[in-house]
Amino acid sequence: MTERIALFPGSFDPFTKGHLDTVERASRLFDRVIIAVMTNAAKKPLFDGPTKVALIETVIADLDNVSVVAQPKTLTANFAQAVGARYLIRGIRNANDFEYERDIAALNQTQDAQLETVLLLAKQEFSFISSSMVKEIAAFGGQVDQLVPPAVAVALQEKLKHGRD
């Protein structure tokens, strides 16, 4: 049987507990899951690519069938082909996410008709978490421990403490 490889692309700036839950669930559905840390030209990143990769590696260390890579500046569909992934994993928090992901899935199909997008609904306890809101809360000194894994919380605190001095 062919190995079922899934790609979970995102900017992950920062990687949240919602992202982690999606990865954990995907790891039970697929033989291998590759987290692709992407550069989103529309966003101003807080963490650089290597830092995000290192943080995510720390967080997923106990997931044997999950790896993380920095995605080169290329289309996600092309990168999926390059790593042998036939599935894209996307987490859905609400109707707005669904609309957006449906359109992206259709566009990805124009690039690779064999690439399937698998949507995982966010669990209730993670449905309100967004990376941009986490960054804003952290930037103003708020508590993010319930929103991000411990290693990410520490990194956020370290990164943003200079702005509050």
From Swiss-Prot:
GO molecular function, a single term: ATP binding
Summary of the function given for this chain in its UniProt record: Reversibly transfers an adenylyl group from ATP to 4'-phosphopantetheine, yielding dephospho-CoA (dPCoA) and pyrophosphate.
GO cellular component entries: cytoplasm
Catalytic activity: (R)-4'-phosphopantetheine + ATP + H(+) = 3'-dephospho-CoA + diphosphate
Species whose genome carries this gene: Latilactobacillus sakei subsp. sakei (strain 23K)
UniProt keywords, alphabetically: ATP-binding, Coenzyme A biosynthesis, Cytoplasm, Magnesium, Nucleotide-binding, Nucleotidyltransferase, Transferase
Gene3D superfamilies in UniProt: HUPs
Name assigned to this protein: Phosphopantetheine adenylyltransferase
Cofactors (names): Mg(2+)
Chief site of localization: cytoplasm
